[in-house]
Amino acid sequence: LLSAAEITVHHAASSSVLELFYCRNGRVGWNMRGGTAVYLGAGDLTAHSSACCADSAMMFPLGYAEGISLSIDLPVLDANCPEILKESGLDLPTIQSTFCGEKPVAIPACPELEGIFAPLYSAPSFRRRAYLQLKIQELLLYLSDVEPEKHALTQYGSQQTELIKEI
């Protein structure tokens, strides 16, 4: 649970580390590098390289956001990929080229995302780690099939968002 009006994010930038943020509750406005802004509501997911959010600011219009944040080093995963994902034909270089470009991809709430993330919140605490490992694999399979251009939320330039905030 992130509880604040705004936070700044500073970390190492890498075009091969996939950053994922699932917003379960609340709202997030995220100003990223290159002047791109993403807005997430309950059930939305953003996927981008850590280079996009290395120096960024997250705003919480409702004063909070609850969700799950994941960082996946794709070359490390590729070298240590679970056999079941290899057998499924999971193509990590394609995931990297699709989601680790210069701009983030925001996917709106949908039954598939709800099905992936909901069990993480309802599982008994002693099973959460196992569920998390399974659900990350399921999320990677989902991302390998999703076509961002058909599902993506609208992105805004940070100048547009500043103008909206002034109004």
Language-model features, listed with the residues they occupy:
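Charged, low-complexity, helix-prone segments enriched in Lys/Glu/Asp/Gln
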Residues: E6, S56, T98, Q160-T161
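A short, Lys/Arg-enriched amphipathic alpha-helix from helix-turn-helix/homeodomain DNA-binding modules
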Residues: A106-Y121, Q133-I167
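Short, solvent-exposed positions on alpha-helices
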Residues: F126-L134
